[in-house]
């Protein structure tokens, strides 16, 4: 797993999504990109970080805001180097085209961001907050951010299910494992 954003808010995000994230980090199963040292939007820096940590299996990338720019570029480059991408969760990467041959999931802090970003690649499934929340609130508190999980049924019917950002992210993890 690979994550990026500023440290304090990222810890709040991880607390809201994963119960044992500190153990996973100690075991090397969870990598946190050091945005205090590198730009979150730098695909090259993220790619070098992934390569340096030498993951032994497919990776799931979660990125927030400008970090989505760097993450999609790094994911595509990692694949070019024969690395495996399990999926990308793009949180509030407004205006960032998301195209890849791996599962992509978009999460937005409001409906407008969700709708307008979907024009640039919506991904397999998505989530948007309703009622809308502040941009940083989505990253800080996914467990309390309510909204709609957009997905298709097995018959192709597009469906909206009420949930939280936390539950959406956990469902993505469960579907990929």
Can you describe what each PLM-predicted range is?
Residues 1-57, 107-114, 121-177:
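Active-site catalytic motif of lipid deacylating hydrolases and related acyltransferases
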Residues 8-9, 69-70, 96-99:
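Short catalytic/ligand-binding loop motif for oxyanion handling, primarily in non-cytosolic enzymes
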Residues 60, 86-89:
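Residue in the alpha/beta-hydrolase core beta-strand immediately N-terminal to the catalytic nucleophile
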Residues 61-71:
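Gly/Ala-rich beta-loop-alpha elbow adjacent to hydrolase catalytic centers
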Residues 73-86:
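Conserved hydrolase catalytic core segment
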Residues 89-98, 109-112:
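Active-site nucleophile loop of the alpha/beta-hydrolase fold
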Residues 97-102, 117:
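Short loop/helix-cap segments at secondary-structure boundaries that form the rim of catalytic
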């Amino acid at each position: 797993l690979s994550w990026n954003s500023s440290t304090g808010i990222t810890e709040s995000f991880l607390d809201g999504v994963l119960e044992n994230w500190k153990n996973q980090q100690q075991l090397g199963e969870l990598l946190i990109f050091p945005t205090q040292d590198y730009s979150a939007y730098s695909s090259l820096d993220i790619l070098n970080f992934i390569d340096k940590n030498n993951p032994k299996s497919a990776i799931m990338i979660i990125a927030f805001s400008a970090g989505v720019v760097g993450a999609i570029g790094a994911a595509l480059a990692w694949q070019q180097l024969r690395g495996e991408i399990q999926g990308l969760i793009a949180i509030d990467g407004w205006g960032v085209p998301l195209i890849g041959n791996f599962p992509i999931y978009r999460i937005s802090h409001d409906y407008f961001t969700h709708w307008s970003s979907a024009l640039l690649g919506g991904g397999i499934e998505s989530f948007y907050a309703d009622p809308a929340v502040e941009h940083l609130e989505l990253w800080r508190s996914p467990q309390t951010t309510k909204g709609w999980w957009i997905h298709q049924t097995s018959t192709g019917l597009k469906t909206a299910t009420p949930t939280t950002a936390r539950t959406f992210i956990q469902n993505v993890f469960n579907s990929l494992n």
